[in-house]
């Protein structure tokens, strides 16, 4: 379900403050955050934000096409392995030999 247009997009306040400080200084740096639920707003464009994905921070460079999306969409937390291993260990089941 989409967020109501009456409300502003959700962004954690400390993240907005850090971005505003860097914009005033006209510097680009990596900003670490644990807030995967924050929405990408236009003031974030051009910055690199390291989003926590459960074990480590994944640096993401923000472009204009990402506005309106959540930070967590660009940092996957699960990696699926394909199928089963090629060689399965054999079972030594003595009951079948009786």
From Swiss-Prot:
Q: What do the Gene Ontology cellular component annotations say?
A: chloroplast; mitochondrial small ribosomal subunit
Keyword Phosphoprotein among UniProt keywords: no
GO MF term list: rRNA binding; structural constituent of ribosome
Q: Where in the cell is it found?
A: Plastid, Chloroplast
InterPro entries on file: Ribosomal_uS19 (IPR002222), Ribosomal_uS19_bac-type (IPR005732), Ribosomal_uS19_SF (IPR023575)
**Principal localisation:** plastid
One biological process term in Gene Ontology: translation
Q: Sorted alphabetically, which keywords does the UniProt record give? A: Chloroplast, Plastid, Ribonucleoprotein, Ribosomal protein, RNA-binding, rRNA-binding
> So which domain of life are we looking at?
Eukaryota
UniProt family annotation: Belongs to the universal ribosomal protein uS19 family.
Q: What does this protein do?
A: Protein S19 forms a complex with S13 that binds strongly to the 16S ribosomal RNA.
The protein depicted here goes by the name Small ribosomal subunit protein uS19c
């Amino acid at each position: 379900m989409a967020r109501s247009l009456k409300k502003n997009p959700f962004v954690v306040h400390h993240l907005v403050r850090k971005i505003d400080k860097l914009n005033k200084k006209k510097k680009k740096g990596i900003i670490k955050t644990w807030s995967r639920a924050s929405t990408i707003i236009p003031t974030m464009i051009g910055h690199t934000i390291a989003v926590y994905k459960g074990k480590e921070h994944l640096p993401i460079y923000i472009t204009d096409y990402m506005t309106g999306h959540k930070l967590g969409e660009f940092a996957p937390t699960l990696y699926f392995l394909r199928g089963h291993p090629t060689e399965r260990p054999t079972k030594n089941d003595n009951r079948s030999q009786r």
